[in-house]
Curated annotation (Swiss-Prot):
GO cellular component, one term: cytoplasm
Skewed-composition ranges (Low complexity): 164-181
UniProt source species: Anaeromyxobacter dehalogenans (strain 2CP-C)
EC id: 3.1.-.-
Annotated region described as Disordered, given as residue ranges: 143-193
Localization per record: Cytoplasm
InterPro entries linked to this entry: MetalPrtase_cat_dom_sf_prd, YbeY, YbeY_CS
PROSITE patterns hit by this protein: UPF0054
Protein name: Endoribonuclease YbeY
Cofactor note: Binds 1 zinc ion.
Residues that coordinate or bind Zn(2+): 109, 113, 119
Domain of life: Bacteria
Amino acid sequence: MIVRLTSEHPDGARAARRLRARAAAFLAALGREDAELSILLVTDRRIRTLNREWRQKDQATDVLSFPISEPPGAGALLGDVVISLDTAARRARSDGRRVGAELDRYLAHGILHLLGYDHERPADARAMAEKEAELARAEGLVGAALREGRREGRAGEAKDRWTRSPTSISTPSRSGSTARGSRAKTSRAGSRT
């Protein structure tokens, strides 16, 4: 397993160490010890530029995925996950959670997109949310996430970002995208995750 992590964020060193370790754990839990993954930790400004370039959406977002293969997840080289540390910090603050818990969620979500999961239809969104929750449970993150940011769901049950289905997230793709600009812009699809 190879996890490459680059931080373009001035405050990203600590988060980068966490994400590298968490990515290895997630890939192992998914049975993808053969995988190669690149993670890029960026500012809102940088992710906004990527979102505008590859998705024609001129706004910052939390995480983008750029699968290498078609279909996603078909080969050992999975692709790139780009995460905005600024967005993670802002949402964690507003939701009363630790930044690390927010980053874990974005990473799990991005990796699942690289493996072919999406949330275009309600059934797909549920399946993806269930897989995210499974990863969180496997890594012991659900209890911590609940302690850090408890939410009330329907019928009063506790919900957190690991167990809620994504609602405002879309996954359009554009052939030829690249997250880091280090690979040729051919046969890649970008997904907002």
